[in-house]
Amino acid sequence: MVHLKSLAGILLYTSLCIASSQQAPASINNAFVAKGKKYFGTCADQGTLSDGTNSGIIKADFGQLTPENSMKWDATEPSQGKFSFSGADYLVNYAATNNKLIRGHTLVWHSQLPSWVQGITDKNTLTSVLKNHITTVMNRYKGKVYAWDVVNEIFNEDGTLRSSVFYNVLGEDFVRIAFETARAADPQAKLYINDYNLDSANYGKTTGLANHVKKWIAQGIPIDGIGSQTHLSAGGSSGVKGALNTLAASGVSEVAITELDIAGASSNDYVNVVEACLEVSKCVGITVWGVSDKNSWRSAESPLLFDGNYQPKSAYNAILNAL
């Protein structure tokens, strides 16, 4: 009997050790959510989602996905009225299977825009095209996308509106048309304006965007959030908290860091950004723009939390320690 008890004890101990060794690694998303935020996410598309190593990190560490390219206009409506959703469907299905939130990106942007849209000069035609595109894309994923970047990069560095086919043909009214159409298409989705270089409170682009959003909200335009892309240079993190406060003061219900990457990926810079979001109550989440430097649009600058071999960097551990 003594031998059986000893054997039972050994088996129990062994099983506990095995279970412990198979536990998922620490998750930045889980730690961030435990601090009261909605998500810590990343961007991807079918290529990176079908990579086993990359996908494994996403499943373990990130709670939200943004399509890097598959929901942009050139991907979803390359020819007028002829929609293609294979890439976007893949991401949406992956997110549903793995319980990840989705930020839809992006409905109206001057870049990655098909030439047939860029060539429109008639107001009524462009209005109709804009409404049809937004409605068709959003209806396909209605109830599945937490937030949409409705308009993307519509400001110049001095805080004025950028020249684009949308602004040149419709004037500032394209913003109202886009947001009202989006609200009608999916009333439950959070509707965002998204831009880059919103990293300092007193910078012209930051104040100009915030002032425009305040005015538009006062006019009844349904803007819920501002997304700050936060593509930073090394050492560029010190102004992020102040900038988020400026954006939050515009009257939106939430702000988010939407495309984070930092040249050199220093622990100090990454922790500064994470703490900025934690300290700004309206900041609901952070999305880093990729998993591994291997797939980053800035790969030469090593800006992400995992290196080219998918190994976590010191900044990854620093974030977990800060949380």
UniProtKB/Swiss-Prot annotation:
Catalytic activity, EC: 3.2.1.8
Keywords: Carbohydrate metabolism, Disulfide bond, Glycosidase, Hydrolase, Polysaccharide degradation, Secreted, Signal, Xylan degradation
Residues forming the catalytic site: E153, E259
The reaction(s) this protein catalyses: Endohydrolysis of (1->4)-beta-D-xylosidic linkages in xylans
Location (main, coarse): secreted
SS bond list: C277-C283
Pathway(s) of this molecule: Glycan degradation; xylan degradation
Pfam families documented for this protein: Glyco_hydro_10 (PF00331)
Keyword Iron: no
pH dependence: Optimum pH is 5.5. Retain 85 percent of its activity in the pH range from 6.0 to 7.0 after a 12 h incubation at 25 degrees Celsius.
First and last residue of the signal peptide: 1-23
Localization: Secreted
GH10 domain residues: 43-322
Gene Ontology terms, MF aspect: endo-1,4-beta-xylanase activity
InterPro entries the record matches: GH10, GH10_dom, Glycoside_hydrolase_SF
One GO process term, biological-process aspect: xylan catabolic process
Temperature-related properties: Optimum temperature is 58 degrees Celsius. The purified enzyme showed complete stability under 60 degrees Celsius.
Class of this enzyme: hydrolase
Cellular component, GO annotation: extracellular region
Protein family according to the UniProt entry: Belongs to the glycosyl hydrolase 10 (cellulase F) family.
Miscellaneous: The promoter does not contain any 5'-GGCTAAA-3' sequence identified as binding sites for the xylanolytic transcriptional activator xlnR.
The name this protein goes by in its record: Endo-1,4-beta-xylanase F3
